[in-house]
Amino acid sequence: MHRLPSLMQTIRSILQVTILLIPSFNLVKAENVIISEIMADNESTLEDGHGNYSDWIEIKNPNPVNFNLAGYFLTDDQSNLRKWIFPDQTIISPNGYLIVFATGQEDSNKTDPQGNPHTNF
């Protein structure tokens, strides 16, 4: 009969440790990003990496973790929702921003010399 209480005490100890550890893990799930600003007909506000004043879209990551935009799309055409796909490993830092230039002249690697993404519209 002494083995049963000993086993029960062991199980109780394991459960107590498990219950104490669960709240200590910081499991953060990234939510969606936000299109926070759009500049159409840019003539003097912000230059792209080629020195041109192109239209641009600002995307904000309100999450406390990095957000990878790989697999996401931007478009200016409701009939073509996958018109421009973000390059792989397009990461926005926690609470950070990304400017995407809508030049219609997508660079071969989708970014300009300064690393700014450029769309094909």
Identify what each model region corresponds to.
Residues 2-15, 24-25:
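Bacterial N-terminal signal peptides that target proteins for export
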Residues 29-121:
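Activation on beta-sandwich/Ig-like modules and their edge loops
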